[in-house]
Every structure is written in structure tokens, then in C-alpha cells.
UniProtKB/Swiss-Prot annotation:
Cell compartment(s), UniProt: Membrane
Keyword Membrane attributed: yes
Assigned keywords, A-Z: Membrane, Transmembrane, Transmembrane helix
Name used for this protein in its record: PA-phosphatase related-family protein DDB_G0268928
UniProt cross-references to PANTHER family, sorted A to Z: PA-PHOSPHATASE RELATED-FAMILY PROTEIN DDB_G0268928, PTHR31310
Gene3D superfamilies: Phosphatidic acid phosphatase type 2/haloperoxidase
Region of interest called Disordered, as start-end residue ranges on this chain: 26-50, 123-172
Membrane topology of this protein: Multi-pass membrane protein
Record GO biological process: sphingolipid biosynthetic process
Amino acid sequence: MGVQQQSELPSQTSAKYFSLREDVSTESLSDIDSQTDINNTGNSGKDYSSPPRLSLWGWYTPSQYRGNSSGVTMKNLSASEDSISLSSLDHQQQPMLMVDHSSNSDNEDGATAKDFKIDIHLKGEDEDDGSGDTRVKYNTRNSGTLRNSSNKTQTTVLNNSTTSSNNINNNNDKEINITTLGGSTNSTTKFLYSSVDQSNGSTIRYPYSPSYSDATFSILSGVVILFSIIYSLLVGPIQIMFAFLVSILVFISYICASFAANNRIYLYSITALAVGLGLTIPSFFAATGAVVLGTGRDKSTWDVELFKSDQVLMGWMWPKGQMAIFVDESTIIGPDSFIGKLSTEILQLSYISYYIWGYFMEIYILYNLWRCHLSKDPQQQKMMPIWDQRLKMFICSWISTYFIVFSINLIFPAVSPRVYIGKTLNLYNNTLEGFGFAGFVRSRIDNAAKGSFGSFPSGHIATSFAIGLSSYKILPAYGFVSTIAAILIAIATMYLRYHYFVDFLAALPVTIFCLLYGGFYTPSDFKNVFVNCFYSIKSIFQNILSKFNNK
């Protein structure tokens, strides 16, 4: 039995108070799968507790954010309706509380008794902001605060499970922030899009457009198959056998996922598809080099132009515009000094970590997707479409960078400073061995990179930043760490003689485009970053000038 919380009324405030006690029997909680819909039309017998149906093109959605009390299910919102109807309430309308009792009971016998205290009042002149909003409060074991104003509605919910923050914008330019506090895990989700689960008629709020994420994922799968066909026509499938087999895996698994009869088949198919798309990295990297050699593009590489561009852009800072030459000639941080050896080891380790960040995040998303499917908790099952969408969007942000880079490599093949400056021009006097480990890794990379012409733009830089920034939208801590690793990788590519500075510059727009393509970011996000940077730099210069003027 919940305990009512005492509340003191502020003076000169018109307020109405009432208490609502709600007892839920054990029978209504014992079998969630037996709950049926009794909506406003009088229809019954439709099961809304079944797991959501997953599909590449069906956009099936689970029945979450749905109120149920004593076996009676509230009418579900249509796809055109906003996720929470309270945002459109005016002061004369009574707010509606939607309570979900599908969670575990606090009592040992399974029964739950909850006490609500609801405070409805208009702000008076004694409150400073004068927005004249309607405030609704209720206290219970799962307590919360909901605020409805003309511009913004904010809801805070306290529970014992997870922590999440959700922002929902409706068609009336009102924003709904839903923050859930408690438990050991933290996540941030913005639910902006509604869609109807065609398998049971229920509604889910997606953080991103399901139509967009499904379309971009399908386009990426088609691009992989198209590259395989074009490469096969240019040099034959035998020369690119690994990439050809991977493209077949992508094609078959995509077809199976599109026509999957149930979630289990879909998950097996989408897992195979995710693995296949992950394998496009090494397979099409080698295939692109084979196509450059097979078409004779290796006879006209662009290393001379890239080297001259570095001299123009960075010649004022480094000799011949190369960080690697500056390090090679330095007596303090040179390859033979202790600092130089330590730097070489750290940066070489950072460089090879590029190969794991994307795969680890892909495995993490697949793990959560399968965990939701295998869970017996209906609330966990209802998160399957969210993790499915995250998988598609992350793969689009991650893998699309490679195919843009591969396309540019075919047009502007280059062998990298390690080969052109080091072996053709002989401008490096020392080798980068570090304490031994770096030299071992470099020898393996040199052997694996024979026949490679992928210097411009830097795929390492483009992909690393795409992984870090997209991962931040899924798992912020992982995204932060992988973004730091991306910065180290960017430095390592030039320090370790793998890329020119212009390779770094060309990789940045590729990263931005792929993040936009994946859907985690919008053009306004990048615009805000540039605007904030501009004003920050402007403020710094203004402060410096003001100090000089004061003197």
C-alpha cells in the first residue's frame, strides 16, 4: 500500500486536490499474454501483449507507452497521432493518466496498491515565469511530474529499473521530454516518430524515422551487390572471389530477412546480413586494389599531387608539409629517442584499434537485439524494433564510409607517403620500430597493404569518426572512448607515414555525409556545432582584445 505524500499549498493559489487509489488484482498481472483490448469501439479479443513483429520493410512496431488498468486497455493512438496526447491539452481539459501494470508487483502476492496525489493548478502571479501553464503531479511508487505549457511539456518518471531521457516533438512544435531515473543503466532516447504494428495494431514511438532507416539500409545492401557486379565485370569474379562471396551472403540474407515468416528467422537473417556487411571491409578493400591493378589505374597514381598539396597547406609548419618528416628529423621526438619510441608504440596501437571499434559496437547491438527476443519480459521484447533500428542505422553510418572511400580510390589511386615518400623519394632516414611491437605490426601491415591504392581519402579517419559519433547516440561512454581513439588514429595516420594531410581533410566531409546518411545526425546538428565554435572563437578573441585595450 503506497503512502500518500503530504503537500503544502502555496498562498494565493487556486488548487484542486483529489486522491485516486487503485487496486490491481493478481489475476490481472499473472498472465500478461492473456490481456485483451477493450477499446472505445467495443471491440475485444485483440492481443496487444504479443511481441512486436520485425521486418525490413514492414515497419512493425510493439505496443509500448500503452495504459492498462484492471484488464482494460486504453485505446491505442494511430500513426498520425502524437505519442502523448497531453501535449495538446488546454487548461480546461482534464489530464489523463495512463498507468501500465505489466511491470513486476511490489507485493509478494502479486497485488499492487498505488496511491496517487494529483495537484492541478494554474500558476499565479506569485510564480516568476508567468507562462500560465497547467501543472500535473502525481506521487506513487512509480512517481512522476508532468508539466504542460504552451511551448514545452516535461514528464519525469522515477522507477527501479533503468534511466532514459526521451524527447518527442509533435506537429504543434511542442516538445515532450520524458526522463526515467533509477537503476544501474543509463540511456538516452528521443522518440519522434509513430508507427503501427500491423501484427497487432499497437503503436511504438521510434527515436528516428523507421521508413528512412529501412530505406538507407536497403540501399546500402544494394550498393554492396552493385559493387560486386561492377568489379566482376571489370576484372572477373575470380580476382575478387572473397568480395564476390560476401556479396552473395549479403544478397541471400537480405532476401531472407525481407520475407521472414517470424522474428526468429528474421533475427537469424539480419545477423547473417550484419556479419556479411562487416566482412565487406577487408574483402572489398582487397578487391578495390585488384580492380586498380586490373584496369591499369596503378600507372597513374596521384601521390605527386597529394604531396604537393601538403607542401602548400602545411609547408609553413612542417618540412615539405609532412609531420612524418618533421618527426624523422627531430632529435627530441625522433624515432630513435625514448619519446619517439613510446609515441610510435602508442600511435601504432591506436592505429590498429581502428579495426575493432566498429565490430565491437555491432556485436553489442546484436547482443541486445537477441536478448530482447529471448527475454520473457514483455517490456524487453517491445524494445526489439528499437535495437533493430539502431543496428541498421549504425551499419549505414559505418559501412557506407568504406564504399564512398572505395569509389574515390578508383578515381584517385595513391600508394601513401610510406611508399611514395619513403621508397620512391627516399626522404625518410629512420625506420619506425618503437620498442619492437610497433615494428612487428608495421611489417605485417606492409605485407597486407601490397597492391593497395587507398591513400586518398583516409578510410581510417573517415570510418573512425563515423563509428565514434554514431556510437555516442547508442552508448555514450563507448562513443566517447572511440571518438578519442579516432583522434589518436587521425594523428597516427600522418605520424606513422600512412596518409597525407589532404587525406585527412578529404575524410572529414565523407564522415559528415555518412553520419547524415545513417540518420543519427541532421544538418542542423552540424550547423549548430560550427556556429557554436565560431562564437566560442569570437568570444576568446574579444576577451584577448579587451585585455589589451584595458592595458
